[in-house]
Each structure stands twice: as C-alpha cells, then as structure tokens.
Amino acid sequence: MSSLVVINPNSSQSVTDGIDAAVDPLRSFGVPIRCLTLAEGPPGIESQMQADQTIAPMLALAAAQTDAAGYVIACFGDPGLHALRD
C-alpha cells in the first residue's frame, strides 16, 4: 500500500519524533504515514541559505521512497516544495 511520507528537512530526530506523534491520530484513517528525518539537513532551518541547502538531499530522500503516494514537507516555508513537485 502506498504511504504518505512526511519529511522533516532538518536533521533533528527529536523534531521528527514530535511530528510523528502529532500525525499518529491520522493513522486511524488507514493511510500509512512515515515520518523521515533529513540526516544531511541543518539542525534547524533559520535562513534561506539553510532552506536551499536541504533541496538536493531532500530530493534524493524522496526519490528513494518508492511506495510514496505523496509528501508533506514538515517545515515553515516548505523548502524544496517546487523542486519536489517536478
């Protein structure tokens, strides 16, 4: 079954764990949801340069998710959104 992939574009596993807990109630609808941390990302995204630096590794991470039905970028400003749509 295809899954919804939520990508935390920073490298903070604790942030990803919080996101995973927040989306947990949505799993009751039967759609598998996987939350991933971008290990190559900065610890936090506080500038445009940091946001831009996440794009290439996020595209690689997304491409590796062969069962993804869709993606959510779990970050204010949606870094890489337009690149991920291509």
Describe the function of each predicted region.
Residues M1-P57:
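N-terminal glycine-rich anion-binding loop in soluble enzyme alpha/beta folds
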Residues I55-D86:
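Glycine/small-residue-rich loop that forms an oxyanion/phosphate-binding "nest" at active or ligand-binding sites
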